[in-house]
Regions:
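C-terminal edge beta-strand
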Residues: 27-29, 108-125
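A short beta-strand micro-motif common to beta-rich folds, especially ectodomain repeats
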Residues: 95-108, 116-118
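Surface-exposed or secretory-pathway low-complexity segments enriched in glycine-proline
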Residues: 46-84
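Extracellular/luminal low-complexity segments enriched in Ser/Thr/Pro
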Residues: 85-97
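Bacterial N-terminal signal peptides that target proteins for export
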Residues: 1-11, 17
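N-terminal edge beta-strand
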Residues: 27-43, 47
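Cleavable N-terminal signal peptides
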Residues: 13-14, 24
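Sec/Tat signal peptide C-region and signal peptidase I cleavage site
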Residues: 20-26
Length: 125
């Protein structure tokens, strides 16, 4: 009887932790185009459904020291998650192209520093 009680308590604990778990962040954006090395600007394109969201990862080789939004999207929102990740959310009901830019400063593994502007074109379906 005691084993059954312990098993029930564990099951209840697991179930309650699943019920109150915070939702995971948006999926990563699949971007066509490659990020250039530090000091060079890049452009990329990705697709997303209207009202959808995804996380953009600044995968510039090396270390991202700082970043900021240079140009906000006109038809969606852009939220900084951390220094190298931004969440883009397309406006509900909008279909078309939304463009925005992020500036990043960092350095290569060899220690060379640079500033890059990453411009992204979101094709909203």
């Amino acid at each position: 009887m005691r084993k059954l009680y312990i098993a029930s308590a564990i099951s209840a604990l697991v179930l309650s932790s699943l019920m109150f778990a915070t939702p995971s962040r948006a999926a990563e954006c699949i971007i066509a185009g490659e990020l250039s090395p530090w000091g060079t600007n890049s452009t990329g394109t990705f697709m997303l459904p209207s009202g959808g969201s995804c996380v953009l990862n600044l995968r510039i080789p090396g270390v991202v020291n700082s970043s900021s939004v240079l140009q906000k999207p006109a038809h969606g929102s852009l939220r900084r998650v951390n220094v190298s990740n931004y969440e883009y959310r397309a406006g509900k009901g909008f279909k078309g192209t939304d463009t925005f830019s992020v500036t990043a400063v960092g350095k290569t593994a060899a220690g060379m520093t640079g500033k890059s502007v990453v411009t992204l074109n979101a094709n909203i379906q």
